[in-house]
């Protein structure tokens, strides 16, 4: 039974598991083969079953298997090895073989039923010529048989070339196969993709079927030496096939040269020292009528039915490389699904784990506005650690949220960092590096101080014009910039508002100034805005000159004023300090020349210089919308020269300078450092305090403005996402939060910002002002539609008036419009409005106290307490607390109050009375009644 194929081995060759054994047995029944779990089958049966399972070729099996009980028949190869009669078996095999040679010549081959020792059966299950059921005995062919074999070669040459072409095309590319094998190759390809990589490797390896020539062992040659010596030397089968093989090789070379095709890969020989393998993978039939082989020859030709031992490693590597390349292409393909993206994100997560090994920097430099992830990158910290630290401190942020100054300071303390904040906009600006000779420039002087201390009047006297009278209420509400000439030298003055609402405007004035003049009224002394102005000047690191105004008034105490300044750290020169205190009178003009000379001396000491060549860099002091001009801005140049026709951008605004007008109303063409002018040609009103940058053309200006707009939009979204735990708690607790939606319109950008900040300061935990829209310019129909869509909304206008059409639309929409010319009135009216929405403060007033001496239970009425008034007056219907042993038991109202049997409105101290509470009867002797009334008071902001 050595030639039989075990069913389990057959399953292993197919790459199937024991679970699929039942399906294989059912498929064997379809071709007439009865199998069981431990059954064995002949190689012929195994081959037909393999073709049926893999290729779908159904060949019925004739049941000619030997009966195991008939031991004398010697039907199995094992029994044939015993010494029995040989001649009858050979003749029987011939008689069975001849009829099949006439019908199917190309599907016949010798069967491995021989009596020789050392016979090896090899099976690849892909042989193109299936073996016959009963193989003939092997004998040595004659010379005529050799000639017939050569003639047979010519007859099958056409079919051999077609099959050879099919084999070659399958080796290069499975998709270029002929139509006869195309469907089979596609089905096999789909099956290979569905199975495991091991099955894929086994099925992709090229297999070959051939004849194995096996030599006798030395002991066999010795036992049969007498038989072989008596025979004459004849040509062996190996020689026959070697001649045939040479002819094929010569014809193959001619065919390949003509078609310029690639040479097929050589098949590695089996590792057997005593055997030779001849490749017949092209289904060539060499079975002739006289192909009878002698058993007694030294060499035997057997049909190869075993799988090839040596695997083609190069093909295996190529298959694996193709799979890897295809997977790599799919991962990098942008049109694929998200699988590749997830793969890359895993790599990023592995990379992030290495962040724990980073060396944290001790000193870092960051911009004023920095995101969480940017801070982590600058400090070389793990992003998760930064977010976790903020979370533990009660602030929930994402990596794209911006950090405020407090958060940056907290992170610096937590991670032991030293942080320097840089005030740059390099990411959004295209400022060129200015190279050239620096020239002397005029000083920029900012006049600051408390409201109504005479700042604008001082500047008015210097300019000899009545500027203060043009402001509403005599209060400066805009930044004014002017140029004044003194002793042949120019000085630029910036007048800032003194009202508390204009803190940001004073801050902008201090940032662009060289010298700060603090105006203090000699009869009023240092006030709140005076201290604030000094703080702005200190932060800007600019020298300070004190102007003691209103010296013309009586009862002026200069020593008191100097003492107040000295307490703040500003010691006068005559007191041994370094600060100049100059007495002036803006009304009479006394001391103004001395002030100007002091300013020029300070400017000479500072040696103020700037580069005049190149692109301009300026600061926007104020922006507004003027009728007939559109958006305009007051700017002061810091470096370079701004000319008419130059392209520029400032924050989200951009444009080209159309006109420039100085403080005298004259048109100018060029604006040099420290000069101020009003420019037109802007796309929108720029924010006050923004930096104006001159660029090469309009395209660059538009691009930079769009970048800045995107940045500001992200920052605004970041503010809406950040929330603290305390804010969440307040939002949950204050379900009845009241707010007033407003639309604010003003004539200038600076005034608009001042109003917004002042109104937002009025917000508290109960009521709030919600600014749904704000802008510079007149009231439009768009503003009305915004207010109409919001309940209880109002429009606030500052220094503007609605047109007739807008008024009609407002009546139609039932929208309230309120306009103001003084900021005081606007803020106070909104304060009153908020106070009206706020719930009043409730206070309690103690009115009386009574002690329970006896209780009376009256059916269907309740419990009446007999009391004595010990303090105050007890009134009917008043609120009362029932106190027992110092603990409040009940709070309610007095339902009935009687004096003996008569009803009483009130009972005074020292008198007895009867008290019955509303819906409460659990009164005991010794309890105390305490009466009180609630007083509602208005809240204050």
Swiss-Prot record:
Job of this protein: One of the essential components for the initiation of protein synthesis. Protects formylmethionyl-tRNA from spontaneous hydrolysis and promotes its binding to the 30S ribosomal subunits. Also involved in the hydrolysis of GTP during the formation of the 70S ribosomal complex.
Residue ranges, annotated region (G4): 549-552
Provenance organism: Helicobacter acinonychis (strain Sheeba)
Keyword Hydrolase among UniProt keywords: no
Domain tr-type G per the UniProt entry, residue ranges: 440-609
PANTHER family assigned to the protein according to its UniProt record, in alphabetical order: TR-TYPE G DOMAIN-CONTAINING PROTEIN, TRANSLATION INITIATION FACTOR IF-2-RELATED
Compartment list: Cytoplasm
Positions with a binding annotation for GTP: 449-456, 495-499, 549-552
CC annotations in GO: cytosol
Any one GO molecular-function label of the UniProt entry: translation initiation factor activity
Chain intervals for the UniProt region annotation (G1): 449-456
UniProt keyword terms in alphabetical order: Cytoplasm, GTP-binding, Initiation factor, Nucleotide-binding, Protein biosynthesis
Superkingdom assignment: Bacteria
This protein's name: Translation initiation factor IF-2
Keyword Chloroplast included in the entry's annotation: no
Ranges for region Disordered: 61-204, 249-274
């Amino acid at each position: 039974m050595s030639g039989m194929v075990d069913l389990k081995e057959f399953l292993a060759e197919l790459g199937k598991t024991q679970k699929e054994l039942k399906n294989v047995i059912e498929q064997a029944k379809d071709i007439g083969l009865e199998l069981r779990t431990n059954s064995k089958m002949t190689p012929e049966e195994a081959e037909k079953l393999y073709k049926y399972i893999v290729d779908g070729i159904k060949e019925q099996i004739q049941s000619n298997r030997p009966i195991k009980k008939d031991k004398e028949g010697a039907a199995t190869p094992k029994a044939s090895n015993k010494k029995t009669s040989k001649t009858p078996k050979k003749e029987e095999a011939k008689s069975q073989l001849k009829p099949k040679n006439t019908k199917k010549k190309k599907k016949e081959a010798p069967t491995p039923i021989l009596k020789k020792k050392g016979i090896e059966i090899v099976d690849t299950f892909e042989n193109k010529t299936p073996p016959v059921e009963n193989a003939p005995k092997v004998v040595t062919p004659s010379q005529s048989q050799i000639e017939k074999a050569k003639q047979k070669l010519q007859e099958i040459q056409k079919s051999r070339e077609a099959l050879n072409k099919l084999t070659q095309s399958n080796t290069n590319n499975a998709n270029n196969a002929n139509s006869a094998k195309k469907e089979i190759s596609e089905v096999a390809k789909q099956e290979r993709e569905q199975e495991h990589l091991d099955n894929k490797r086994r099925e992709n390896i090229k297999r070959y079927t051939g004849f194995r020539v096996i030599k006798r062992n030395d002991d066999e040659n010795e036992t049969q030496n007498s038989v072989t010596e008596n025979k004459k030397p004849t040509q062996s089968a190996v020689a026959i096939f070697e001649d045939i093989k040479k002819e094929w090789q010569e014809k193959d070379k001619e065919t390949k040269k003509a078609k310029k095709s690639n040479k097929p890969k050589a098949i590695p020989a089996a590792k057997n020292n005593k055997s030779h393998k001849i490749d017949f993978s092209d289904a060539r039939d060499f079975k002739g009528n006289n192909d009878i082989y002698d058993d007694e020859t030294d060499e035997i030709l057997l049909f190869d039915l075993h799988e090839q031992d040596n695997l083609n490693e190069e093909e295996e590597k190529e298959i694996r490389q193709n799979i890897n390349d295809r997977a790599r292409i799919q991962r990098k393909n942008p049109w694929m699904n998200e699988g590749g993206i997830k793969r890359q994100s895993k790599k990023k997560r592995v990379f992030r784990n290495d962040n724990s090994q980073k060396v944290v920097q001790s000193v870092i430099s960051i911009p004023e506005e920095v995101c969480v992830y940017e801070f982590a990158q600058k400090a070389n910290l793990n992003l998760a650690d930064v977010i976790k630290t903020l979370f533990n401190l009660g602030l929930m942020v994402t990596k794209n949220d911006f950090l405020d100054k407090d958060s940056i300071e907290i992170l610096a303390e937590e991670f032991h960092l030293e942080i320097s904040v840089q005030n740059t906009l390099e990411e959004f600006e295209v400022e060129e590096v200015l190279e050239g000779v620096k020239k002397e420039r005029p000083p920029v002087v900012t006049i600051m101080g408390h409201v109504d201390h005479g700042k604008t009047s001082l500047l008015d006297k210097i300019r000899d014009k009545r500027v203060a009278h043009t402001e509403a209420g005599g209060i400066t509400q805009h930044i004014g910039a002017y140029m004044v000439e003194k002793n042949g030298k120019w000085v630029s003055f910036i007048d800032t508002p003194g009202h508390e609402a204009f803190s940001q405007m004073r801050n902008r004035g201090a940032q662009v100034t060289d010298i700060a003049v603090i105006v203090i009224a000699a009869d009023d002394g240092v006030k709140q805005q005076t201290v604030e102005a000094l703080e702005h000047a200190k932060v800007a690191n600019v020298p300070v000159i004190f102007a003691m105004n209103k010296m013309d008034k009586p009862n002026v105490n200069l020593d008191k004023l100097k003492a107040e300044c000295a307490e703040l750290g500003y010691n006068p020169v005559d007191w041994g300090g370094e600060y100049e205190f100059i007495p002036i009178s803006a009304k009479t003009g006394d001391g103004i020349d001395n002030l100007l000379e002091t300013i020029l001396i300070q400017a000479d000491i500072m040696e103020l210089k700037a580069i005049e060549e190149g692109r301009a860099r300026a600061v926007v002091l104020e922006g507004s919308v003027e009728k007939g001009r559109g958006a305009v801005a007051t700017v002061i140049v810091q470096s370079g020269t701004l000319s008419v026709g130059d392209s520029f951008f400032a924050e989200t605004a951009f444009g080209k300078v159309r006109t420039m007008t100085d403080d005298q109303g004259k048109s100018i063409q060029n604006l040099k450092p420290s000069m101020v002018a009003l420019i037109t040609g802007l796309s929108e009103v720029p924010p006050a305090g923004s930096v104006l940058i001159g660029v090469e053309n309009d395209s660059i200006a538009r691009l930079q403005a769009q970048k800045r707009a995107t940045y500001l939009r992200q920052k605004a979204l970041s503010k809406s996402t950040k929330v603290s735990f305390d804010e969440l708690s307040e939002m949950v607790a204050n379900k009845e939060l009241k707010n007033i939606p407003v639309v604010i319109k003003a004539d200038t950008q600076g005034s608009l910002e001042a109003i917004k900040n002042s109104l937002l300061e009025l917000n508290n935990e109960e009521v709030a002002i919600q600014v749904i829209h704000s802008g510079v310019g007149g009231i439009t129909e768009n503003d009305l539609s915004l207010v109409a869509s919001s309940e209880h909304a109002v429009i606030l206008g500052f220094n503007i008036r609605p047109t007739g059409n807008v008024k009609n639309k407002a009546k139609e929409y039932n929208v309230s419009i309120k306009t103001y010319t003084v900021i005081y009135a606007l803020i106070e009216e909104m304060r009153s409005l908020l106070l009206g929405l706020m719930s009043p403060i409730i206070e309690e007033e103690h009115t009386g106290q009574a002690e329970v001496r006896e209780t009376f239970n009256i059916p269907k009425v309740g419990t009446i307490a007999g009391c004595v008034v010990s303090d105050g007056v007890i009134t009917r219907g008043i609120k009362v607390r029932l106190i027992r042993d110092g603990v409040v038991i009940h709070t309610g109202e007095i339902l009935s109050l009687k004096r003996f049997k008569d009803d009483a409105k009130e009972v005074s101290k020292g008198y007895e009375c009867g008290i019955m509470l509303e819906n409460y009867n659990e009164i005991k002797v010794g309890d105390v009644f305490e009466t009180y009334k609630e007083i509602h008071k208005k809240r204050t902001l």
